[in-house]
Amino acid sequence: MIFFNEEKLIKKLDKTRLPQHVGIIMDGNGRWAQKRGMPRVYGHKAGVNAVREVIRSCRELGIKYLTLYAFSTENWKRPKEEVDFLMDLLVEYLSKEVDELNKNNVVVKFIGDISRLPEKCQIEIEKAQKLTEKNTGLVVNIALNYGGRDEIVKATQNICKKVLNRELSPEDITEDTITQHLYTASQPDPDLIIRTSGEKRLSNFLLWQSAYSELWFTEVLWPDFKKRHLIEALLYYQTRKRRFGGV
């Protein structure tokens, strides 16, 4: 019945009006586990299945860019045991999934301050990016140790260095200058941002890039997020008239 409903929903989609870039704030892993009387870390493990499904669904539907908010600059405040588990889970996910992603022509990129992550994570990240860099299909950005404010600060610092080195004049700095110094330089801004778990805020996610993004919030907890929920978000997106500040 679920697959039948998915097919009915897909038929409603206008394939000519799909977003190029979808961003997802993957929220609710801990609550998913707690509702089942399990430690929070089990929710993170269950969330990997949702990551796998949403990547497959975006490929099938023809989405070109997908950005997943996996670990924020603020998440270091969580208990050490939980942070350590998340880092181990990242290594496990990449070691198991990257060959399949590569086979499916997916480009894997990581955005955020990767230098602060454990060395074992950095090694797997480097392997994944190198293996998939020449692919031409869906681009998956995984935001790790990422914060929108931090990204803007780092972009500003790099621009200031260019001004000091006389590579750039202050008068020539434009919005596009800042855009080209962000982690997502050369990619389109997200057309649609999805947040699971019922929370209704951006939580420091793609702050510069989301200026004109459509926002879709769902009560569904991340481990329960399926293809049909993604299609519901896309159908909502297609009801919106995007004016970008115009009439």
Swiss-Prot record:
GO annotation, cellular component aspect: cytosol
Location of the active site: D27, N75
Keywords in alphabetical order: Magnesium, Metal-binding, Transferase
Keyword Cell inner membrane carried by entry: no
Taxonomy, superkingdom: Bacteria
Gene Ontology molecular function, alphabetical: ditrans,polycis-undecaprenyl-diphosphate synthase [(2E,6E)-farnesyl-diphosphate specific] activity; magnesium ion binding; manganese ion binding
UniProt record, GO biological process: polyprenol biosynthetic process
Enzymatic class: transferase
Enzyme Commission number(s): 2.5.1.-
Cofactor: Mg(2+)
A Pfam family this chain is assigned to: Prenyltransf
Subunit structure as annotated in this protein's UniProt entry: Homodimer.
Function text: Catalyzes the condensation of isopentenyl diphosphate (IPP) with allylic pyrophosphates generating different type of terpenoids.
Name of this protein: Isoprenyl transferase
Organism: Caldanaerobacter subterraneus subsp. tengcongensis (strain DSM 15242 / JCM 11007 / NBRC 100824 / MB4) (Thermoanaerobacter tengcongensis)
Taxonomic classification: Bacteria, Bacillati, Bacillota, Clostridia, Thermoanaerobacterales
Originating gene: uppS
